[in-house]
A protein has these predicted regions:
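Polar, low-complexity loop segments and adjacent catalytic/binding residues used for recognizing
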Residues: 29-138, 143, 147
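Conserved glycine-rich SAM-binding loop
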Residues: 1-6, 160
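Hydrophobic "anchor" residues on beta-strands that sit immediately upstream
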Residues: 17, 154
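Mobile active-site "lid"/loop adjacent to the S-adenosyl-L-methionine
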Residues: 109, 113, 160-180
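Conserved small/polar residues in nucleotide/adenosyl-binding loops
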Residues: 22-28
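Long, positively charged, glycine-interspersed low-complexity recognition regions
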Residues: 175-260
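Conserved SAM-binding loop of SAM-dependent methyltransferases across substrates and taxa
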Residues: 4-15
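Glycine-rich phosphate-binding loop signature in dinucleotide/nucleotide-binding domains
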Residues: 148-152
Length: 260
């Protein structure tokens, strides 16, 4: 039986298995609240009364300014992890509301389109079932993968896409970090002789595809609907680049899945 880790970093790299340290950052706080069934109950009630208004959006932004969003060294205790506080729930609700109600989910600019928060509540219940036994790590992805990688494990990475680096200013993920990411994962692949499998998702960028292939990784372009463009351009498509250290099509067939 393989252990699974989910980790959260400002660079948005996510691994598969679930063991983590909790930091009082915005995404981490949300995950921690979802994990605790008592907190989740309060959160669902709070979000059910959510108001999609510009004033509420600005109030949430002001609330979240005081919440740290850096890789702090926080010493965890069971009390920190399990204590339910109304402040945690309010911050989690404010963060989720501003992700849903903002333009392009940046949390910074109010989006005019009406959105019903109640439609998101079943997703939170699903998230609870998936991560209730997880520990959420908030560390640099290289530190987490070095710690967690072992034969038989699988790692999923969802880094900032090429051209969106400015949206992750607090993560210090500039354009050079793409090359660093691939070099690091190549080292992981060699160190574990290919017994640690990983999948990286990107936008279909020629430079990224070239770097991936230079390291000998398999690539596949997956076409799907571009959800952010459907209101103005129905049927608009988006090309997602899948990168792995294994044969993607062969593995998909083994799992009775099909890439197109």
């Amino acid at each position: 039986m393989h252990r699974q880790y989910h980790f959260v970093s400002d660079a948005e790299a996510h691994s598969l298995h679930s063991v983590s340290y909790t930091h009082l950052t915005l995404p981490t706080n949300l995950f921690r609240v979802i994990q605790n069934n008592e907190k989740l109950a309060y959160l669902l009630g709070r979000l059910y009364l959510s108001i999609n208004g510009e004033l509420a959006f600005k109030q949430n932004k002001d609330r979240l300014k005081g919440v740290p969003n850096i890789l702090d060294d926080v010493i965890e205790t069971s009390q920190i992890f399990y204590d339910a506080s109304w402040e945690d729930i309010q911050n989690a609700a404010a963060f989720l509301e501003n992700q849903v109600y903002s333009f392009s989910s940046t949390g910074q600019t109010f989006g005019i389109a009406r959105r019903d928060m109640s439609q998101r509540l079943p997703r939170l219940m699903s998230a609870y079932n998936r991560i209730r036994d997880a520990i959420i790590l908030h560390r640099d992805y290289k530190d987490v993968i070095t710690y967690a990688a072992c034969p038989g494990s699988f790692i999923l990475l969802d880094p900032p896409y090429k051209g969106t680096e400015d949206m992750y200013s607090k993560a210090n993920f500039d354009i050079e970090q793409h090359d660093i990411l691939f070099s690091f994962m190549s080292e992981v692949n060699q160190q574990h002789h290919g017994e640690v499998k990983f999948l990286i998702t990107y936008n279909n960028d020629p430079y990224i595809r070239g770097v991936a292939e230079k390291h000998g990784f398999d690539t596949f372009v997956q076409t799907r609907l571009h959800s952010m463009k459907q209101s103005k351009e129905a049927g608009a498509l988006y090309e997602e680049l899948l990168i792995a250290n294994y044969d993607l099509e062969k593995q998909a067939a083994a799992n009775h899945l099909y890439l197109d």
